[in-house]
């Protein structure tokens, strides 16, 4: 039953950030018991509400998959604590993956990604599932062409990141959204904040 609280926490953080006017200094997520210092946020991708909202839109958009049937949220379902409930996740065409989808709550605090640790940042990680044939199975040029053909996406990319849809901009936006998905008040959060 913690899922509604986690989702509410993520939405509260987004609403807090929405108070920032365009052109202002990057807004920060509300501190989570003093844990901000542990979040790895690249200098070239500070947490900003407009980028997070673009990332959220992309995260839930099935057009990122090869056949338009799956999105990041298909396996990282907010109703299931941003995970899924099966031992092996399935991707486009019902293909079974080799592992289940890990929960992505608090992944902004991570320092390595994928089961083998091959990605050192969320920006590096997010493009992997998009192109993996057992997950979203898309060709990156095709995804970028679909996004570029959508005038609302072109406007949102330009407004948030100052560019047309590119692989780097796509990765930065989704990574920002994933960083905004935080639990906020677990026992571990309180421990790291010094409340033992």
Task: Enumerate the language-model features and the residues they cover.
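Periplasmic c-type cytochrome electron-transfer domains
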Residues: 3-5, 19-196
